């Protein structure tokens, strides 16, 4: 067959810019409001436009997380571990893209950005390994004075609202999201407001991995609009307020208390600006898994 040669390009090629969307129920919708906001580097250079999620978008995300909760919690612990490990595998294949987005958003050099991305991948692997060990480590067979067996079994809390760390757009997010998922919870995440791009790319990894739609739902936008609604939503069972600023912490905790939510927050005296997410002793802990588990105690008569 003859070879067909394409003619010289008449005009310079225009780059295809990426559209950063929300992630709700396994799909990538734009905000129902049609709004967006500009994401820039720390130096003020424009990077992209991100969707500015609305209250309705958040309600849709909570609804999707609730629908996905029971099937996700019913999966075997080993299977959840395999799925989280698969996330690490796919992140490894897109490492260069994550490095570029972390470097641009956080103002890091290529070396430090690569370190943050590789630590994020390793963190998925670390938490995946905990999936089938939670029952043995956190559960117990309790001694009782009577003809009964008494067992304590960890169970997932339900739908967890997660306000991601603002400064560490990828490693901080993974460090808070992975312990929520490994225990069988589903999540509604409000990404870093100023540095949301790596989080959106992470959802593209989740969508192409084995994580079922609705298990993770991620919103970008203004925290002043989204966080109070998340904290007060009656169908959210727990909230992680790590990314909430000190000025807003009391208000968020009061809203969470109205609907009796389980609450996880930064330890007192710990600043999000100074916390070292690369510190394996401080930033990956089984206690962070336990924060979103409830302990169910079962009594059973001996011989029955």
Task: List where the protein language model places each region.
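Short beta->alpha linker loops
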Residues: 53, 105, 115-119, 193-197, ...
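Glycine-rich beta-to-alpha transition loops that act as phosphate-gripper elements at the mouths
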Residues: 163-164, 219-224, 242-244, 266-268
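Hydrophobic/aromatic ligand-binding patch that stacks against planar heteroaromatic rings
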Residues: 178-181, 229, 255
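C-terminal segments
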Residues: 2-5, 9-12, 122-137, 151, ...
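N-terminal Rossmann-like NAD(P)+-binding subdomain of aldehyde/semialdehyde dehydrogenases
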Residues: 1-148
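Short hydrophobic alpha-helical runs that function as membrane-insertion/retention elements
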Residues: 187-190, 217-219, 238-240
